[in-house]
């Protein structure tokens, strides 16, 4: 409400007080106004609530409270979630706190800060998340300011199965230290089961921040500052998922396809959950009871043994099915089991980081345990395992099209290991173990780094081979329902046209109606020489360049290991050739597209 409107309402202030407020407000920025509102609220809760306005204004200007700034660099939302929890805990502890998306934070402002915590995930091959590219580059440039007065902490999130584990967090730590900043707490690098150690680190960090701020400004009125960007609110979350209903699980690859890809439909009716194109759905799943039994047999346990999980005593069998990751191996598991079993093969792998990473990334837990049989205690077994985490799937529907449903495109992991068939955890849960009508626990993971342009007239280029097509089904449904005038160009690729053309009928319908203006496909095994989406991009290089000149946004979804790199290289070649630029200039041009959010990727 504007201050000038106060006089027309039943206000407890007299005209002189209103005039004083108007005068003070005219000289303050929006952030300062928000601070003042919190300051006055704090005064109202104390015995000094009758302090005159002019005295309060003087207090605001002469005794600003120290604050903690939290910056999150997040690709899929995990780092954002940790940062939001940190912000809430700081506010509850009476610490003035402000939360920033890294894309909204200007690096030069660090010189004015006293206490900062950065929560950073790592994208692809050690790259900064899209929302942190600009800040990441700034801090390693000559423009980075001296930060002698800054005290900082860093939480890195990652997956130890990858070579550049928590690299972005390590980078920020190094950048800040180089500029003279002092860590008030040691950086922590957290694996996929990060929740418990992250909570402990947050507690330690906030204890140190509270003590430091108290000593800096004993008399300052501590208030809570606003979050830099409004967060999505819902009663359901990763920690409190919604129990939804599976409506459909339909195979959409041909009977002779080497792949089993499912179109999944889930009912959200009554949940209040909302999502936008580009968001992901988190799915909590249960492990295969048969796999749990096989693991127990391999290590000489029955499953009846009691183990403590989250303060509760449950059977080991139940723990393996519901609480622990028993499908995918990881380097730590391989290294620890090498010690427990005395396996020479595993010991040799553990001594070579590259081979260890490759082995653990392509091997399931049961196959690691089968390298050499060893009898374990229940505690030793669960000590080897990570906690179960939900799987995130790109949402393949627009809510403007499907209303109270959410659709997924799930590639079922299934392959032979010797004489045994191995299955993926979440994908086999959704495709084989759940029946239509069964419950499934889900939550929405918002992704602000993969969003359609706000301008409906902007052209869009979508590159999504395989199940990477999922978000683009959502994009096109949304653009259709919004009557967006912008052109849409889809690149899709897979193995065989007759077996693996996902949602073929839908794309042909959209092409015929003009919603999709151009569709280019690459089926790698339909000819002797393999053809992939990056080849189609290069074939249409002149047209791609023209679309970029017309303001097109480029989106890439799918495999990070090869496809995303090859597409990135193809885009650089397009810019170099048709933009008449040097290689270095072309790389910079593509990088500027990313900074401007005109080149967005959801790769995994």
Swiss-Prot record:
Residue ranges annotated for the Flavodoxin-like domain, each copy included: 68-206
Residue positions binding NADP(+): 524-525, 530-534, 566
UniProt: FAD binding residues: 327, 361, 391-394, 409-411, 415, 424-427, 604
Gene Ontology MF term list: flavin adenine dinucleotide binding; FMN binding; sulfite reductase (NADPH) activity
Pathway entry: Sulfur metabolism; hydrogen sulfide biosynthesis; hydrogen sulfide from sulfite (NADPH route): step 1/1
Record keywords: Amino-acid biosynthesis, Cysteine biosynthesis, Electron transport, FAD, Flavoprotein, FMN, NADP, Oxidoreductase, Transport
UniProt: FMN binding residues: 74-79, 121-124, 157-166
GO cellular component: cytosol
Classification via PANTHER family: NADPH OXIDOREDUCTASE A, NITRIC OXIDE SYNTHASE-RELATED
Assembly: Alpha(8)-beta(8). The alpha component is a flavoprotein, the beta component is a hemoprotein.
The protein's name in its UniProt record: Sulfite reductase [NADPH] flavoprotein alpha-component
Organism: Aliivibrio fischeri (strain ATCC 700601 / ES114) (Vibrio fischeri)
Lineage: Bacteria, Pseudomonadati, Pseudomonadota, Gammaproteobacteria, Vibrionales
């Amino acid at each position: 409400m504007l201050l000038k409107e106060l006089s027309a309402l039943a206000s407890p202030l007299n005209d002189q007080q209103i005039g004083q407020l108007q005068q003070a407000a005219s000289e303050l920025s929006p952030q300062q106004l928000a601070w003042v509102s919190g300051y006055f609220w704090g005064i109202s809760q104390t015995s000094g609530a009758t302090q005159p306005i002019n005295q309060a204004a003087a207090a605001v200007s002469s005794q600003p409270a120290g604050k903690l700034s939290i910056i999150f660099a997040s690709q899929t939302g995990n780092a954002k979630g940790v940062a939001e929890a940190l912000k809430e805990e700081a506010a509850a502890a009476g610490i003035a706190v402000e939360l920033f998306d890294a894309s909204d934070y200007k690096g030069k402002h660090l010189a004015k800060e006293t206490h900062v915590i950065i929560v950073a995930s790592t994208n692809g091959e050690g790259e900064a998340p899209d929302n942190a590219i600009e800040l990441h580059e700034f801090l390693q440039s000559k423009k980075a300011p001296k930060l002698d007065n800054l005290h900082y902490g860093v939480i890195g999130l990652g997956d130890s199965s990858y070579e550049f584990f928590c690299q972005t967090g390590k980078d920020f730590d190094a950048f800040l230290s180089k500029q003279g900043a002092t860590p008030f707490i040691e950086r922590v690098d957290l694996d996929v089961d990060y929740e418990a150690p992250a909570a402990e680190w947050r507690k330690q960090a906030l204890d140190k921040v509270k003590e430091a701020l108290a000593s800096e400004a004993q008399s300052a009125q501590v208030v809570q500052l606003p979050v830099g960007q409004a967060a999505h609110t819902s009663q359901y979350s990763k920690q409190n998922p919604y129990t939804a209903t599976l409506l459909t699980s339909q195979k959409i690859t041909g009977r002779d396809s080497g792949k089993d890809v499912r179109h999944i439909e889930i009912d959200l009716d009554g949940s209040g959950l909302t999502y936008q194109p580009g968001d992901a759905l988190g799915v909590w799943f249960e492990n295969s009871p048969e796999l749990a039994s096989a693991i127990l047999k391999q290590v000489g346990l029955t499953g009846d043994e009691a183990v403590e999980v989250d303060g509760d005593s449950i059977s080991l069998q139940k723990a393996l099915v519901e609480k622990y990751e028993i499908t995918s191996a990881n380097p730590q598991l391989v290294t620890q089991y090498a010690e427990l079993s005395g396996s020479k093969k595993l010991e040799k792998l553990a001594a070579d980081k590259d081979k260890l990473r490759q082995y653990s990334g392509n091997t399931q837990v049961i196959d690691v345990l089968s390298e050499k049989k060893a009898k374990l205690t229940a505690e030793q077994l669960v000590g080897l395992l990570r906690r179960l985490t939900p799987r995130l799937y790109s949402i393949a529907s627009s809510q403007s099209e499907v209303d109270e449903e959410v659709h997924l495109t799930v590639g079922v992991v299934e392959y032979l290991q010797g004489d045994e068939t191995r299955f993926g955890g979440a994908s086999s849960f959704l495709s084989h173990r759940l029946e239509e009508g069964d419950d499934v626990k889900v939550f929405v993971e918002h992704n602000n780094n993969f969003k359609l342009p706000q301008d409906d007239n902007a052209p869009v280029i979508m590159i999504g081979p395989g199940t990477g097509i999922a978000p683009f089904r959502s994009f096109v449904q949304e653009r259709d329902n919004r009557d967006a005038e912008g052109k849409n160009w889809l690149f899709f690729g897979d193995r065989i046209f007759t077996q693996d053309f996902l949602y073929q009928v839908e794309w042909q319908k959209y092409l015929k109606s003009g919603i999709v203006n151009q569709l280019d496909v690459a089926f790698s095994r339909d000819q002797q020489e393999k053809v992939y989406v990056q080849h189609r991009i290069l074939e249409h290089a002149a047209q791609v360049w023209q679309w970029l000149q017309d303001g097109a946004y480029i989106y890439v979804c799918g495999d990070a290991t090869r496809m995303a790199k090859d597409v990135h290289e193809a885009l650089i070649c397009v810019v170099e050739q048709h933009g008449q630029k040097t290689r270095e200039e072309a790389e910079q041009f593509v990088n500027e597209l990313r900074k401007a959010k005109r080149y967005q990727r959801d790769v995994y």
